[in-house]
Curated annotation (Swiss-Prot):
This is UDP-N-acetylenolpyruvoylglucosamine reductase. The active site is at R182, S233 (proton donor), E310. It catalyses: UDP-N-acetyl-alpha-D-muramate + NADP(+) = UDP-N-acetyl-3-O-(1-carboxyvinyl)-alpha-D-glucosamine + NADPH + H(+). Keywords: Cell cycle, Cell division, Cell shape, Cell wall biogenesis/degradation, Cytoplasm, FAD, Flavoprotein, NADP, Oxidoreductase, Peptidoglycan synthesis. One of its GO terms (molecular function) is flavin adenine dinucleotide binding. HAMAP family: MurB. Belongs to the MurB family. It is an enzyme of class 1 (oxidoreductase). Residues 212-229 have a biased composition (Basic and acidic residues). GO terms for cellular component: cytosol. InterPro entries: FAD-bd_PCMH (IPR016166), FAD-bd_PCMH-like_sf (IPR036318), FAD-bd_PCMH_sub1 (IPR016167), FAD-bd_PCMH_sub2 (IPR016169), MurB (IPR003170), MurB_C (IPR011601), MurB_C_sf (IPR036635), Oxid_FAD_bind_N (IPR006094). Pathway: Cell wall biogenesis; peptidoglycan biosynthesis.
Length: 318
């Protein structure tokens, strides 16, 4: 575990941010920025609004030897109870916008909220992105994990990704990026910052699009814990198949292992959908981590299958 940032280090760092007119906030409880509603107080959140500010803040991080992590919508994330040994970077301003470029092409900022953004784009009469209207979080995070459901993935639609890597700007086509099921190369490159994407959609029938939006919304609502604080599916489906060719789902393995409804502290493996862990109101990151380890061990004991996490950890979680 890294040491807590010193007061003098933070003071000089914040003074430089003020001089550079880069927006920031101090002493922010990160739990309020996550769908899990779990996470302790971070000393500083820096919120750059334009690309030049992102480049500048990376230089400032390096100058003051400040460890940092980037936070998006916080929907597929378990945040540390003590995120006090790093600074959080969270895009704002123009990164929250999307614009039509014409002929079904859209430029979408990394800090746009996926659910309303892709619903609005679909309701303009373009089809292919309806499934993304059911996925919470921000577009940047959806890119990093190649978010998908109902047979669709974000990279099916992407024309290009704009990102910073080691302070240098890149625009890459999907063919130039490693990606797969709930995976992209950005997952393993913590020095990369997604700034935005361009996608290409086809024109469609608005009535059929509205019907598709409703169908996917209803399916999502019926298959997930209702009005519960969670981070979505905890484990990836293992890509293991039965003799009849049907894929074995992660939730089935949890259920067969008798894990449905298990509780640790304020966290519970959902009785409604056991590939979800829910915050009953007082859960800590440690509570959730305990249940994750329990699932991995128990499922391996009962099935011989090793499950991999879909949610990401943010900070040190014992």
């Amino acid at each position: 575990m890294s040491p807590v940032l010193s007061e003098s280090q933070l003071r000089d760092f914040k003074h430089t941010l003020e001089s550079s007119k880069i927006p920031f906030r101090s002493e922010v409880r990160l739990g309020i920025l996550s769908s899990f509603k779990i996470g302790g107080v971070c000393p500083v959140i820096v919120e750059p609004e334009i690309s030049s500010q992102v480049s500048e803040i990376l230089h400032i991080f390096s100058k003051f030897d400040i460890p940092w992590k980037i936070l998006g919508g916080g929907s597929n994330l378990l945040i540390s109870d003590h995120p006090d040994n790093f600074v959080t970077l969270r895009l704002s301003g123009k990164f929250k916008e999307f614009v039509s470029l014409g002929d079904g092409k859209f430029k979408i900022g990394a800090a746009t909220n996926t659910t309303p953004t892709f619903r609005q784009i679909s309701q303009l009469g373009y089809t292919g992105a309806e499934f993304l209207s059911t996925i919470p979080g921000w577009t940047g995070g959806a890119v990093i994990q190649n978010a998908g459901c109902y047979g669709g993935e974000l990279f099916d639609l992407i024309e290009s990704v704009e990102f910073l890597r080691n302070g240098e700007m890149f625009v890459r086509k999907p063919s130039e990026i490693k990606y797969g099921y709930r995976f992209t190369e950005f997952l393993n490159q913590k020095d990369s910052i997604i700034l935005g994407i361009e996608i290409l959609l086809k024109e469609g029938n608005l009535e059929e699009i509205e019907s598709s939006l409703k169908d996917k919304r209803d399916r999502r609502n019926s298959s997930q814990p209702e009005n519960k604080k969670s981070a979505g599916s905890v484990f990836k489906n293992p890509k293991v198949f039965r003799e009849d060719g049907k894929e074995i789902k992660a939730w089935e393995l949890l259920d067969q292992a008798g894990l449905r409804g298990q509780i640790k502290g304020g966290a519970q493996i959902s009785p409604e959908h056991c590939n979800f862990i829910v915050n009953l109101g007082t859960a800590t990151a440690s509570d959730v981590h305990y249940l994750i380890d329990l699932v991995v061990d128990r499922v391996y004991q009962t099935s011989g299958i090793l499950l991999n996490r879909e949610i990401e950890f943010f900070g040190d979680i014992p």
